Amino acid sequence: MAQFAAAGKAISKKNLAEIAMSYGYVYVAQVSMGANMNQFLKALTEAEAYHGPSLIIGYAPCEMHGIKKGGMQNCQLEMAKAVKAGYWNMFRYNPTLENNKLTIDSGDPSADYQEFIANEARYARLAQSFPDRAKDLFEKAEESAKERYERLKKMGKLYE
């Protein structure tokens, strides 16, 4: 098993959705089926109807995430927790709409980010191996998630 970032990744991950939206002609949605099935289905329907390229990015835990409480039988619940903690934002961007091109479907984070990542063994392994580094990286990841959400809200206002 390859563990490319077993010691933690110090830089922020790329934001594929923002990159695609910057083109201005790509339908983009970020979904989490376990958090909101209706939003997931709406995104699929809109993407299929869109005359142009569409990109749907879904949050889907896998066995390697190592969900501590209940394992993969709780993956739908884990998807909902990711959204509530602000780890994953749900939205739809439709460039053909005149108003409200960007719809944010997930609300403000309402759950503890650190508690969410503590429930996944992939993060717990880092905390066991490099506790100080893990604490620092987890705090940076939470801050990055907050910044992503704030940037998304600002983009939403631009597209009103």
Language model feature labels by segment:
Residues 60-160:
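Flexible, low-complexity linker and terminal segments
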Residues 1-107:
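Glycine-rich ThDP/TPP pyrophosphate-binding loop and its adjacent helix/strand module
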